């Protein structure tokens, strides 16, 4: 299958082309038997000769090209309607009946605050043109009205509030929120890309629109992405400030699986400058060794690193309503538990395997763990180095 993507260097186009090329090269293996042979990437630096050639060969078209922030309103119609006409005329010239997807906007509803939107009018004109083209030529046309988009590679200070907030907060720049109670419906770029690939496989989601409201319908003229989220500006900014403060608080906010918070955190990280990808941790040192907190959580306690010098015994205490788990990753020593109130029931644990020790209401002792290094402990936003340490020390992993 050969795919033509117009607007390939824009926010949506770049993300879509990246995944399409992953499928083409076999890096993305989660789409069944979908096979992509070529991805034609058309943008402002492409030629009309290239467009003509690609329109003659392609098996599917993603039309993402458009104008969002022109210098004058007339450019909306030229950029959004004019190019659409050129694209469809070129496909028609070659008799190419490949399915065509159109990227439109919620503003094309021309309702509510979008009633006088020049951008919305140009998008609505493009929709009508595509739908008419489909009816007249027997071509499958997929018109998507996207809400507010966000995700990696989205340009800040352009047309995405989330991109601007992420960029400014990550880079210590001020932000402006006129009304924190304003609610946005937002669509994450990876969810959009998944829907585009579903459309490529003939599994798109159809609907009708009642104003801005999506009405799912198998026979609907329009299409939509089924996974969106709603959040107020205040909620978005509050989450971003929590992400920003993590190096100081070490507190990981609640990030449920498949949540808006998870998507927003991934987006925020993509705007971090290089010098913030790593940060120092506070290393509490004394004659016994050191203790360093790594992360705190709201519901699951904290994670820390404890380094003991040779011959040192730590512990010798117990908790009423707290439990601890120890994972020994380097060195050697003896961990013991004794049942409170008796000298009996002393438990020894294996010394030469990577193990996890659960500590209930027992006194525990930790002996003979040597120092593994010196200087500041730093936390990386990378995978854990434990496996590397194991291999270097010849420690068996169980």
Q: Where is each model-derived feature located?
A:
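NAD(P)H-binding glycine-rich loop region in Rossmannoid oxidoreductase-like domains
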Residues: 43-86, 90-94, 107-114
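Conserved Rossmann-fold NAD(P)-dependent oxidoreductase catalytic core, especially the SDR/UDP-sugar
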Residues: 85-127, 134-137, 141-142
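Conserved beta-loop-beta element that borders a ligand/cofactor-binding pocket
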Residues: 128-153, 173-182, 217
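A conserved pocket-lining segment of Rossmann-fold NAD(P)-dependent short-chain dehydrogenase/reductase
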Residues: 147, 164-187, 207, 216-225
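Mid/C-terminal beta-alpha module of Rossmann-like enzyme folds, strongest
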Residues: 198-283
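A short glycine-rich, His/Asp/Glu-containing loop-to-beta-strand
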Residues: 276-316, 322
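Conserved C-terminal "lid"/linker of ANL adenylate-forming enzymes
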Residues: 346-398
């Amino acid at each position: 299958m050969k795919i033509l993507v117009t607007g390939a260097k824009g926010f949506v186009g770049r993300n879509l082309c990246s995944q399409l090329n992953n499928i083409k090269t076999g890096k993305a293996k989660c789409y069944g038997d979908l096979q992509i042979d070529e991805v034609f990437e058309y943008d402002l630096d492409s030629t009309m000769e290239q467009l003509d050639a690609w329109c003659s060969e392609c098996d599917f078209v993603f039309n993402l090209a458009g104008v969002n922030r022109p210098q004058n309103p007339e450019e909306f119609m030229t950029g959004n309607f004019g190019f659409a006409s050129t694209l469809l005329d070129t496909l028609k010239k070659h008799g190419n009946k490949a399915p065509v997807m159109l990227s439109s906007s919620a503003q094309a509803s021309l309702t509510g605050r979008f009633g006088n939107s020049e951008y919305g009018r140009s998008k609505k004109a493009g929709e009508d043109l595509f739908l008419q083209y489909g009816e007249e030529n027997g071509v499958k046309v997929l018109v998507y009205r996207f809400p507010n988009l966000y995700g990696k590679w989205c340009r800040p200070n352009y047309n995405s509030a989330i991109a601007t907030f992420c960029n400014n907060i990550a880079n210590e720049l001020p932000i402006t929120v006129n009304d924190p109670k304003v609610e946005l419906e937002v669509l994450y770029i990876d969810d959009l890309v998944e829907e585009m690939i579903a459309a490529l496989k003939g599994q798109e989601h159809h609907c009708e629109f009642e104003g801005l409201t999506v009405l799912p319908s198998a026979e609907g003229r329009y299409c939509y992405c089924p996974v969106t989220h709603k959040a107020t500006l205040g909620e978005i900014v509050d989450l971003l400030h929590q992400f920003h403060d993590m190096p100081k608080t070490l507190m990981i906010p609640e990030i449920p699986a498949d949540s808006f918070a998870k998507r927003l955190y991934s987006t925020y990280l993509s705007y971090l400058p290089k010098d913030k990808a790593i940060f120092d941790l506070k290393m509490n040192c004394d004659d016994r060794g050191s203790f360093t907190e790594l992360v705190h959580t709201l519901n699951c306690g904290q994670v820390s690193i404890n380094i003991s010098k040779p011959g040192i015994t730590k512990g010798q205490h117990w908790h009423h309503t707290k439990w601890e788990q120890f994972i020994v990753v380097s060195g050697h020593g003896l961990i013991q538990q004794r049942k409170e109130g008796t000298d009996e029931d002393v438990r020894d644990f294996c010394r030469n395997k990577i193990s996890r020790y659960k500590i209930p209401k027992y006194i525990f002792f930790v002996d003979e763990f040597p120092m593994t290094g010196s200087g500041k402990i730093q936390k990386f936003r990378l995978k854990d180095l434990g496996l590397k340490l194991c291999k270097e020390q010849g420690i068996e992993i169980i």
